[in-house]
Amino acid sequence: MPKGNFYTQVTYRFRSDDGSETAASWLAAENTDTTIALDTNFRIRIAVASSGLDTWTNLVWNLYYSLNGSSYTAVTASSPVKFSASSNFADGADTTNQLTKESYLNFITNNNGMKETTGGATNSGNAGAGDGFETEWCL
């Protein structure tokens, strides 16, 4: 990664695991927390923006959680916050632009952003300053 290139979480939004990448229902407005029943699959969608030019080939994004203000830990299939299989999308499918886009100019379509049973969304292609993508995780 080039020195001085930063990636920023622009926005997030919770949704139900009740439909496809484009049709699942939203649980709350952007950047708004929600309450989810225990042992209920849900999805969180996160927009990420790049501050500079970078080759995104094999760049891996991971999801982390923190319980009660403790340190951040990577989400796995067996952690307290864990990945969950979804019958509504394929792991590694591309996401479309569904969140507010004002913080980045170009949406990267080859993004492999839909994630369920494995960690790490792996991008391919190039990103320039102001480019971004969305990743959605089923938990």
Region spans (language model):
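Polar, enzyme-active/binding microenvironments
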Residues: 1-139
